UniProtKB/Swiss-Prot annotation:
GO molecular function: 4 iron, 4 sulfur cluster binding; 4-hydroxy-3-methylbut-2-en-1-yl diphosphate synthase activity (ferredoxin); 4-hydroxy-3-methylbut-2-enyl-diphosphate synthase activity (flavodoxin); iron ion binding
Catalysed transformations (reactions): (2E)-4-hydroxy-3-methylbut-2-enyl diphosphate + oxidized [flavodoxin] + H2O + 2 H(+) = 2-C-methyl-D-erythritol 2,4-cyclic diphosphate + reduced [flavodoxin]
Protein role: Converts 2C-methyl-D-erythritol 2,4-cyclodiphosphate (ME-2,4cPP) into 1-hydroxy-2-methyl-2-(E)-butenyl 4-diphosphate.
Protein name (database record): 4-hydroxy-3-methylbut-2-en-1-yl diphosphate synthase (flavodoxin)
Keywords, sorted A to Z: 4Fe-4S, Iron, Iron-sulfur, Isoprene biosynthesis, Metal-binding, Oxidoreductase
NCBIfam families the UniProt entry points to: ispG_gcpE, PRK00366.1
Length: 367
């Protein structure tokens, strides 16, 4: 373990109606692919992302047209909106004025002190945080001159430089990212950052690649970082539909037991014993439970040999055999069902468990 269990020892930072850091769960983020000034397209994509489980969304802000679109976008969405700014402080001011819940900007890159002061003053007045985005591919010349090439120490030094600029202006609502496309470099940078400061860390492996390769690369890098107890919010960067980024991020958090509001599927690898159409059933169930916001573990198993034992780990499951299925709940056989109704019966049982969970949550809230 690292010296800091970062998820529980970071400074809590408010982003819209969420708190990132402190004792809060890791938050899933994504970024739109639309032109931000196209409000209709941007809002439509954000709503798709939210439906997939995205909790915070970022939009690019390359020009004043994009900045001026922020109020119209904000009115139509319900998750916090982060605005990505590079170099032009006037865009940051416009985005903040328009209702951005957070801005991503490196204070050392926007020029003279009065520009930084103006952005910090506006952020303070609105009570919104600033994310410092350190990227191995765009480190300052002085850092590269000192270290020769992108290193974890250089990335941390860059982060501390930007942090100091904000702290000197008495600004502390800061979130930091330490992104690199090299997995080992990213892991080292985040580990060193977690020891260097207590601001929340936004995790990401940048330029990770296509849906398949990027998923593997992100899972390797982000998984190693999360396993050290580091990270408060995460974005999986893929050259794909951003909805896929959210799916991968949620699945990754579920793998480490870090998503209390998500259902999980267990399904066995195929073998010669299987007597049902396991692959299509597993895919259908994965899609079905993806929108369930309850910590339910669902098993889809292909035979009665390993099924009963493996189903014990699940809240609900089915083991197929010779044209029928054994429906399990908490490892106990509930009943036999014909293969043709197996999936629908399983869905009904999942819905019952979800309803029980939500009813229990309401009781706890009243208590």
């Amino acid at each position: 373990m690292t010296e800091i269990t970062h998820r529980t020892k970071t400074r809590p930072v408010k982003v819209g109606n969420l708190t990132i850091g402190g004792n809060n769960e890791v938050v899933v983020q994504s970024m739109t692919t639309t032109k931000t000034h196209d409000v209709e397209a941007t809002v439509a994509e954000i709503k798709r992302l939210e439906e997939a489980g995205c909790q915070v969304v970022r939009v690019a802000c390359p020009d004043m047209r994009a900045a001026e679109a922020i109020p119209a976008i904000k009115k139509q969405i319900s998750i916090p909106l982060v605005v990505d700014i590079h170099f032009d402080y006037k865009l940051a001011l416009k985005a903040i004025e328009g209702g951005a819940d957070k801005i991503r900007i490196n204070p050392g890159n926007i020029g003279k002190r009065h520009k930084v002061e103006a952005v910090v003053k506006a952020a303070k007045e609105k009570g919104i945080p600033i994310r410092i985005g350190v990227n191995a591919g765009s480190l300052e010349k002085r850092i590269l001159d000192k270290y020769g090439y992108p290193t974890a120490d250089g990335m941390v030094e860059s982060a501390l430089h930007h942090i100091k600029i904000l702290e000197d202006l008495d600004f502390h609502d800061i979130i930091v990212s330490m992104k690199a496309s090299d997995v080992n470099l990213a892991i080292e940078a985040y580990e060193k950052a977690a020891k260097a400061f207590d601001y929340p860390l936004h995790l990401g492996i940048t330029e990770s690649g296509t849906l398949f390769a990027g998923t593997v690369k992100s899972a390797a890098g982000l998984g190693a970082i999360l396993n050290m107890g580091i990270g408060n919010t995460v974005r999986v960067s893929l050259s794909a539909d951003p909805v896929e980024e959210v799916k991968v991020a949620r699945e990754l958090l579920k793998s480490f037991g870090l998503a209390s509001n998500a259902a999980t599927l267990i399904s066995c690898p195929t073998c010669g014993r299987i007597e049902i159409d396991l692959i299509s059933i597993a895919n259908e169930m994965e899609e079905y439970i993806s929108k369930i916001r309850a910590p339910i573990k669902v098993a889809v198993l292909g035979c009665a040999v390993n099924g009963p034992g493996e189903a014990r780990e699940a809240d609900i499951g089915i083991a197929g055999a010779r044209g029928e299925g054994l429906l399990f709940r908490k490892g106990e056989i509930v009943r036999k069902v014909p293969e043709e109704t197996m999936v629908e019966e399983l869905k009904k049982e999942i819905d019952k468990i979800a309803e029980e969970y939500f009813a229990k949550q309401k009781e706890l809230e009243k208590a």
